[in-house]
UniProtKB/Swiss-Prot annotation:
Pathway: Nucleotide-sugar biosynthesis; ADP-L-glycero-beta-D-manno-heptose biosynthesis; ADP-L-glycero-beta-D-manno-heptose from D-glycero-beta-D-manno-heptose 7-phosphate: step 2/4; Bacterial outer membrane biogenesis; LPS core biosynthesis. It is found in: Cytoplasm. It comes from the Bacteria. Mg(2+) binds at D10, D12, D129, K130. InterPro entries: HAD-like_sf, HAD-SF_hydro_IIIA, HAD_2, HAD_sf, Heptose_bisP_phosphatase, Histidinol-phos. CDD domains: HAD_HisB-N. It catalyses: D-glycero-beta-D-manno-heptose 1,7-bisphosphate + H2O = D-glycero-beta-D-manno-heptose 1-phosphate + phosphate. GO terms for molecular function: D-glycero-beta-D-manno-heptose 1,7-bisphosphate 7-phosphatase activity; magnesium ion binding; zinc ion binding. This is D-glycero-beta-D-manno-heptose-1,7-bisphosphate 7-phosphatase. Transmembrane segments: none annotated. The record marks R103 as: Contributes to substrate recognition. Its cofactor is Mg(2+); Zn(2+).
Length: 173
């Protein structure tokens, strides 16, 4: 039975500032407000699951080992700052033209994470900064989809647009 709730989190643009194909810890900078968001969600019992497209691997911009080392740095930094880690890391290494089954906006990474962590999608949130993040959430049937964006988009979709993490914290109960 799926009884856990989760925050499905994009990495670049949500966890860290998106500087384009971030692969080294020297280039990794946490987003302002992300620690507060993660702490709030964790205190309410949410699992924290990273869902990220990392096409830089297959494009040859960086290696799988680079990604794994940066992910280890991310986890160690979170533990040092907050006393906990992300509960799961799910990534797609493919470029869009490879037409794989795992790249957002396809839902398979979210569905895999939900299955492995017994997540109730009705009680969960997808948090991202791009349309592909929101569409992945919608395609996976995640009930709540929060888009971090400074300039609101006109969209027929049911996601909620937030200008900062404070707005998101107020929505996550």
């Amino acid at each position: 039975m799926n009884t856990n709730k989760a925050l499905f989190l994009d990495r670049d643009g949500i966890i860290n500032i998106d500087k384009g194909y971030v692969s080294q810890k020297e280039d990794f900078e946490f987003q302002k407000g992300i620690f507060e968001l993660l702490k709030h969600a964790k205190s309410l019992g949410y699992k924290l699951l990273l869902i990220t497209n990392q096409s830089g691997i297959n494009r040859g911009y960086y290696t799988l080992k680079d990604f794994e080392q940066l992910t280890q740095y991310l986890q160690e930094s979170l533990f040092k700052e907050l006393g906990f880690n992300l509960d799961g890391i799910y990534f797609c290494r493919h470029a869009p033209e490879e037409n794989c089954a795992c790249r957002k906006p396809k839902p398979s990474l979210i569905l895999q994470a939900a299955k492995e962590h017994q997540i109730c999608l009705e009680q969960s949130f997808m948090i991202g900064d791009k349309e592909s993040d929101m569409l992945a959430g919608l395609n996976a049937k995640v009930k709540n989809n929060l888009l971090l964006i400074q300039n609101p988009l006109k969209t027929p979709h049911s996601w909620i647009q937030c200008k900062d993490f404070k707005e998101m914290i107020d929505l996550i109960k």
